[in-house]
């Protein structure tokens, strides 16, 4: 990450000097640094809400119960983590939130999972294999319901706003599989034997799989309607579960929510570093300088130039990629229902802002040496792009 942090601004400086855009670069650098603080503080309310709800679920035993049901799978993915460790339940909550397209909820759950994983870290400041794998799964971002894309398509008058659901699911399943495989191959060293501990029978995992398949079918069929119900239902369900388990839900909620501000402040230095580097590359024109000729090459194998631009922008900037998506869909030559419109929505919905996720998740626990996490994230992003193109070719074209 040290080399990445140097090379991005250095490339931006060279390109800006060549094109005469130094004034723009200077302004963008300061704007990116200033923007990190409101971005972090903007997370405070959402973090407080979902960390509070998570504390209620934790005290009620929901996280432990969920981890036990999924233990046959979790123990193979994360053999370094003890079977009954609270990190297991926190990771499940994070993946579930991503699955439903609840990015705002997934971040607090993911940070809590990272904190639990850090408690097992023998070398503080260096990411463990479990932390790298968990982050890689997050950058792949398995998603059933890409809510923001569906909302944008609906607002632009799409005849079928939920058309992106099926290709997005396929692309995220592929990118997640590649993320897991790349993390395993790049971690080095010997494999850790699967721990033995309290585990649910395999029928519990099978029942969960069937339930997930039913949920996928429901979201594909009625995703646009169901999407508005998810967050209110989640709040009521978790608080209701706490009452049923005789948890003092107000005290538990406040205890968890109190951590929201501290976490947001803790990630500011990491956000500044990433956002400044990314902002300089975008403002200098270095990104376009690389991607425009690359797009002409990828078009020869069926990958549109705008898809390459979207994939690269998505890895670097959430707001930038969403702005690009909206701009392209408003273009009369593309529109939301064309092949390119659906493809761009699928790429956005099936990937994550890799650099931002690394900054937030690792920054929250003070990880400075990220090992192979960035490589895994970018490999997963590339796999997701290829899968999105193929899925849209088969299902849409």
Task: Specify the residue positions occupied by each region the protein language model found.
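Hydrophobic transmembrane alpha-helices of multi-pass small-molecule transporters
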Residues: 1-27, 31-40, 185-264, 397
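Hydrophobic core segments of alpha-helical transmembrane domains in multi-pass membrane transport
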Residues: 5-18, 47-55, 139-143, 147-151, ...
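Transmembrane helix-loop junctions in multi-pass membrane proteins
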Residues: 17-27, 58-62, 144-160, 215-226, ...
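Membrane-embedded alpha-helical segments and adjacent helix-loop junctions characteristic
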Residues: 23-119, 246-331
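Short hydrophobic alpha-helical membrane-embedded segments
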Residues: 85-90, 203-211, 350-351
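Membrane-core helix-loop-helix motifs of multi-pass transport proteins
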Residues: 117-206, 335-397
């Amino acid at each position: 990450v040290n080399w990445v942090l140097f090379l991005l601004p250095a490339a931006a400086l060279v390109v800006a000097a060549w094109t005469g855009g130094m004034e723009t670069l200077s302004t963008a650098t300061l704007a990116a640094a200033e923007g990190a603080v409101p971005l972090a503080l903007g997370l405070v309310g959402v973090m407080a809400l979902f960390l509070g709800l998570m504390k209620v679920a934790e005290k009620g035993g929901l996280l432990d119960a969920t981890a036990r049901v999924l233990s046959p799978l979790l123990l193979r993915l994360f053999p370094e983590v003890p079977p009954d460790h609270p990190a297991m339940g926190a990771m499940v909550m994070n993946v579930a939130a991503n699955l439903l397209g609840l990015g705002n909820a997934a971040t607090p759950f993911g940070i809590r999972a990272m904190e639990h994983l850090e408690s097992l870290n023998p070398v503080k400041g260096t990411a463990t294999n479990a932390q790298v794998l968990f982050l890689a799964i997050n950058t792949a971002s398995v998603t059933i319901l890409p809510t923001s894309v569906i909302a944008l398509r609906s607002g632009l008058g799409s005849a079928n706003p939920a058309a992106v659901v099926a290709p997005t699911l396929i692309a995220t399943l592929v990118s997640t599989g590649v993320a897991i495989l790349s993390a395993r191959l790049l971690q080095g060293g010997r494999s850790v034997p699967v721990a033995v501990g309290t585990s649910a029978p395999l029928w519990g995992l099978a029942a969960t799989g069937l339930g997930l398949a039913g949920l996928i079918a429901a979201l594909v069929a009625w995703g646009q309607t169901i999407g508005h119900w998810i967050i209110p239902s989640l709040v009521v369900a978790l608080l209701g579960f706490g009452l049923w388990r005789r948890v003092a839900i107000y005290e538990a909620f406040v205890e968890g929510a109190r951590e929201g501000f501290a976490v947001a402040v803790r990630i500011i230095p990491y956000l500044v570093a990433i956002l400044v580097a990314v902002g300089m590359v975008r403002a200098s024109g270095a990104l376009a300088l690389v991607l425009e000729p690359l797009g002409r090459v990828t078009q020869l194998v069926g990958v549109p130039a705008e898809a390459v631009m979207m994939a690269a922008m998505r890895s670097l900037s959430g707001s930038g990629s969403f702005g690009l998506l909206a701009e392209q869909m408003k273009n009369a030559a593309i529109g939301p229902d064309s092949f390119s419109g659906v493809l761009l929505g699928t790429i956005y919905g099936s990937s994550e802002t890799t650099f931002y996720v690394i900054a937030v998740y690792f920054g929250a626990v003070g990880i400075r040496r990220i090992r192979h996490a960035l490589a895994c994230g970018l490999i997963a992003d590339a796999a997701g792009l290829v899968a999105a193109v193929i899925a849209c070719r088969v299902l849409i074209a």
